[in-house]
UniProtKB/Swiss-Prot annotation:
Belongs to the class-V pyridoxal-phosphate-dependent aminotransferase family. SerC subfamily. This is Phosphoserine aminotransferase. It comes from Burkholderia lata (strain ATCC 17760 / DSM 23089 / LMG 22485 / NCIMB 9086 / R18194 / 383). Keywords: Amino-acid biosynthesis, Aminotransferase, Cytoplasm, Pyridoxal phosphate, Pyridoxine biosynthesis, Serine biosynthesis, Transferase. Pyridoxal 5'-phosphate binds at residues 101, 152, 172, 195, 237-238. GO terms for cellular component: cytoplasm.
């Protein structure tokens, strides 16, 4: 029996995608091979690779000025790869820290330059807000400005993206990419791990403006140098072929759903249902300011935290899995990515109401 999976990542996958992958596991399109057996330079995989790139460019509206790269190492590796590729002759990059992941990015950048904290969303209750542009104190000549547009752990999402002129904006979009339309032209670099809305763990997405490809530090490994990866169409070394294949199936699924406008409408409906349930209750609490609440990751706390384990056990009995909050913040977290259906959120809300009534 399939359950409703609220994991933050690796996360729920569209069932259609899983079934198609299962059907094609032993014999992809009459080739007699599984995708995971194919040469990454053979015509079979090349057709998969090119289709994935084309479909993603179409879904996001990626302009011709930007290259799409498939790498490895996840978002955490990009915390090192970004400064190694963008600092160039400069030493400073600015960071807007809105949660745990942008804090990790800021800390990692200290190994390669002198990062500057331009703004923070931290309050006495933790990370609960997204600083607006007027609050950003940028340095005089930063190589780039870094922002995590959705903080998976803290449940903070930044919706208003400013125009920074000649300063490249770098965004970690790991946990909200493909959940809503984006103006890619506003960004110098977008990056994210795949294991939330793109597909399975193993491939990392980077979208980089071409004019930024000549800034790499000499210490940057060739396998992580964006210019080298772009020149080789993401095939400089053996790529994570099966993860790219799965990502391609997800892109096709998204197009069948009506694209990102249709997906965004669904996600707004799911998030509203869950937040309304939390806000109308004295038993559940979300600490994030309403304007910065994530549509993808909804942390919440029980008024009586001694009942956390009872809540999780009861949820599991109803087929509602992986609701435990991140160890750094505690409580609960429901990750309601694209593949989590409205029915799953309705089932969670019904359980939350039942659990509250039993404890009243």
């Amino acid at each position: 029996m399939r359950v409703f999976n609220f994991s933050a990542g690796p996360a729920a996958m569209p069932e259609e995608v899983l079934r198609q992958a299962a059907d094609e596991m032993l014999d992809w399109h009459g080739s007699g091979m599984s995708v995971m057996e194919m040469s990454h330079r053979g015509k079979e995989f090349m057709s998969i690779h090119e289709a994935a790139l084309t479909d993603l460019r179409d879904l996001l509206g990626v302009p011709a000025s930007h290259r799409i790269l498939f790498l490895q190492g996840g978002g955490i590796a990009e915390n090192a790869i970004v400064p190694m590729n963008l600092l160039g002759s400069r030493k400073t990059a600015d960071f807007v820290v809105t949660g745990s992941w942008s804090q990790k990015s800021f800390t990692e950048a200290k190994k390669y330059g002198t990062p500057h904290l331009a703004a923070t969303g931290k309050t006495e209750d933790g990370y609960t807000r997204a600083p607006v542009r007027a609050e950003w104190q940028l340095s005089d000549d930063p190589a780039y400005v870094h922002l995590c547009t959705n903080e998976t752990i803290d449940g903070v999402e930044t919706f208003e993206i400013p125009d920074l002129g000649d300063v490249p904006l770098v965004a970690d979009v790991s946990s909200h990419i493909l959940s809503r339309p984006m103006d890619v032209a506003k960004y110098g670099v977008l990056f994210g791990g795949a294991q939330k809305n793109i597909g399975m763990a193993g491939v990392t997405l980077v979208i980089v403006r071409e004019d930024l490809l000549d800034r790499a530090l000499s210490i940057c490994p060739s396998a992580f140098e964006w210019k080298t990866i772009a020149a080789n169409n993401s095939l400089y070394n053996t790529p994570p072929t099966y993860a790219i294949y799965i990502a391609g199936l997800v892109f096709q699924w998204l197009k069948r759903q009506g694209g990102l406008e249709a997906i965004e409408a669904r996600n707004i409906e799911k998030a509203k249902l869950l937040y309304d349930t939390i806000d109308s209750s004295s038993f559940y609490l979300n600490k994030v300011e309403p304007a910065a609440r994530s549509r993808m990751n909804v942390p919440f706390f029980l008024a009586d935290e001694t009942r956390n384990e009872d809540f999780l056990a009861g949820a599991k009995a109803r087929g509602l899995l992986q609701l435990k909050g991140h160890k750094s913040v505690g409580g609960m977290r429901a990750s309601i990515y694209n593949a989590v259906p409205l029915e799953g959120v309705k089932a969670l809300v019904e359980y939350m109401k039942d659990f509250e009534q039993r404890g009243a």
